From Swiss-Prot:
Ligase among keywords: no
Positions of transmembrane segments: 388-408
Record family assignment: Belongs to the ZP domain family. ZPC subfamily.
Chain's gene name: Zp3
Domain notes: The ZP domain is involved in the polymerization of the ZP proteins to form the zona pellucida.
A GO MF term: carbohydrate binding
Any single Gene Ontology cellular-component annotation: extracellular space
Free-text description of this protein's post-translational modifications in UniProt: Proteolytically cleaved before the transmembrane segment to yield the secreted ectodomain incorporated in the zona pellucida.
Main localization, broad class: membrane
Role description: Component of the zona pellucida, an extracellular matrix surrounding oocytes which mediates sperm binding, induction of the acrosome reaction and prevents post-fertilization polyspermy. The zona pellucida is composed of 3 to 4 glycoproteins, ZP1, ZP2, ZP3, and ZP4. ZP3 is essential for sperm binding and zona matrix formation.
Name of protein: Zona pellucida sperm-binding protein 3
Protein's cellular compartments: Cell membrane
Amino acid sequence: MGPSCLLFLCLLLCGGPELCYPQTQWLLPGGTPTPAGSSSPVEVECKEAELVVTVRRDLFGTGKLVQPGDLTLGSEGCQPLVAVDTDVVRLNAQLHECSSGVQVTEDALVYNTFLLHDPRPVNGLSILRTNRVEVPIECRYPRQGNVSSHPIQPTWVPFSATVSSEEKLAFSLRLMEEDWNTEKSSPTFHLGEVAHLQAEVQTGSHLPLQLFVDHCVATPSPLPGQNSSPHHFIVDSHGCLVDGLSESFSAFQVPRPRPETLQFTVDVFHFANSSRNTVYITCHLKVAPANQIPDKLNKACSFNKTSQSWLPVEGDADICDCCSNGNCSNSSSSEFETHEPAQWSTLVSRNRRHVTDEADVTVGPLIFLGKANDQAVEGWTSSAQTSVALGLGLATVAFLTLAAIVLGVTRKCHTSSYLVSLPQ
């Protein structure tokens, strides 16, 4: 078969001349494969108290070098040390300065942050040749062993008599799979899906405790109180899951799996006026003695659309009545009732200095696919089985159609070659 026929068949099957020749592959931030021997465009080194992020200036593998000034680490308050070489940019920062949140699991401390490439026009031009991309970064540290130089307190000391620091109770907030048995492996969601959140406290040697979610707020950036506009309250008024009042079916799970665990679902969403496709959820968790009767300040209430009423996970139904007007406080705790996000961080940190039974925990980023920036993050999620099946079906139909065309073209090319060779 002549070269022209081969080229025609390649154009017909591949759809363009650029696919008919060997192509160099690069590892983009979205996870596209790299050629053998090439390094990842973003490398992270998690040290004892700091992290070092090394970014290839040819971040997208296109030959267009990113500007060091367009790279940031974590929230706006983070100011890492930046070292620029010919080919790479290194960002060095302390974990506590640039981490967007800390998650506590059974065996690890997990620090979350993100690398942001936000290109700006240069030289007075109004065009951009690189994309905006946000790369989630995670550093995990094992929790095994006693890191304190002080003697371990006896395990028989009652909770009410124990003077301890906040670290004595390990609070956590995790994204779970639909069956609640395992932690979710991917942070990506599509609109219409449901996020399964599990709040938990490791009580250790304390007497039995019961966990409550006092309030939760969702923001496009990690820290409420910083860049807190826009924001959306999921839980408010000391345990009212107010997100369920809208068109969603967000609710606490009944019954609890354990007193120290509380599970709830949230219909996923994204912020309409935000350029980010990420959402961080920060919850204020607290505990009370397990034998304490739930009340207006310690409750877990969901809105039931069928009965148009608030229902508690446990306790009398009237403890949820205050969710309708948001007045679930009393005179001694009214300071907590009105908490705009900009005031939240300061308020909580000030009041938690002398409190050992509550903590703020952040989970995120939740990454929403389907927006403009998703090409950079879509590589982190597994291909959906439905999409694969649909793709295979379409490919089969296309192959059968093209096979008939190819067969006809092949015969024509063969006949033409035979006729030309006759005079010889």
